[in-house]
Regions:
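Phosphate-end processing signature that detects enzymes handling 5′-triphosphorylated RNA
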Residues: 1-292
Length: 292
């Protein structure tokens, strides 16, 4: 297996399709990117036991090779997540014996092993760069493709920054540097979570009371709008960011940034100011919430 005590730390960023060329031309990504075609199948029980537990189980095919991956529910927010992850090569089918030995399946989920079946798929092309930034090594990937859940489809168009060595603070620093020129924004939803929501046709929004919770709710609403194309989620996001900007508990030093976020809302797909403000707020507010 990949390692005995795995931890994946990454920052996920949504990217408008029209701005792909800005990524490819960015001066921090001058080296040619490796391009990989990845076909992924996610598994769960008919009643969604893994999804409810915040577990993602997939087979990833790249050429003639197949990897089996298990990811747990993470902690973080504002696009940043820290999750346990196990990954190892298999012969093309689920390795149930190895699954049974993993912590998530040793107790409550052990009975799910005989009921696992494919529930959704993601197919995308991944372009990958290794970036040295502020003394850290970061893998930056650009994923383009689609999520398929039954007849439903959603577009994958995102950047992921994964810490390979160094300090997690460098992920924020690199994202903020990219956001100076690229209209990206934090994304709160993993591909597996997006697929599960797409399958159900439901995109629940989290309750909010504190400034960090309002930011989280607004970002989740934008993710929901992207996949559902329901404009009510766009209105929900704007309402959440309005509540954040006027919140009495918001640090006064952050209020101008929250207002800048709100002011740039309607031009967020072309103007970098929205994403830069969202990243700055997410970093400073240090959102801590369970992720799926």
């Amino acid at each position: 297996m990949k390692n005995a005590n795995p931890l994946e730390i990454e920052l996920k960023l949504a990217l408008p399709k029209a701005c792909l060329d800005r990524v490819e031309r960015h001066p921090m990504l001058t080296e040619g990117a490796e391009a990989l075609t990845l076909a992924n199948t996610y598994f769960d029980t008919p009643d969604g036991a893994l999804s409810r537990a915040g577990i993602a189980l997939r087979l990833r095919r790249q050429g003639n090779h197949t990897l089996q991956t298990v990811k747990t529910k993470g902690q973080g927010g504002g696009g940043l997540s820290a999750r346990q992850e196990w990954e190892w090569p298999v012969d093309g089918t689920l390795d149930l014996d190895a699954l049974a030995a993993l912590p998530p399946f040793e107790s409550a989920l052990d009975e799910t092993l005989g009921r696992l079946a494919p529930v959704l798929a993601t197919d995308f092309v991944r372009r990958r760069w290794l970036v040295e930034h502020q003394g850290s090594t970061i893998e930056l990937v650009l994923d383009q493709g689609e999520i398929r859940a039954g007849e439903a489809r959603a577009t994958i168009q995102e950047l992921e920054l994964e810490l390979k060595a160094g300090d997690a603070a460098s992920l924020w620093a690199l994202a903020l540097a990219l956001a100076e020129a690229i209209p990206l924004r934090p994304s709160e939803s993993s591909k597996a979570a997006r697929g599960n929501q797409l399958s159900r046709g439901e995109w629940p929004l989290p309750d909010a009371a504190t400034p960090s919770q309002w930011l989280h709710r607004g970002l989740v609403a934008l993710d929901a709008h992207l996949d559902s194309t329901d404009d009510s989620f766009q209105a929900d996001a704007k309402s959440a960011f309005t509540a954040l900007a006027v919140h009495p508990e918001l640090d006064e030093a952050l209020r101008p940034t929250a207002q800048a976020l709100l002011d740039a809302f309607d031009t967020r797909d072309s103007d970098p100011h929205f994403g830069h403000a969202a990243l700055a707020l997410a970093h400073r507010l240090a959102i801590e919430s369970a992720l799926s």
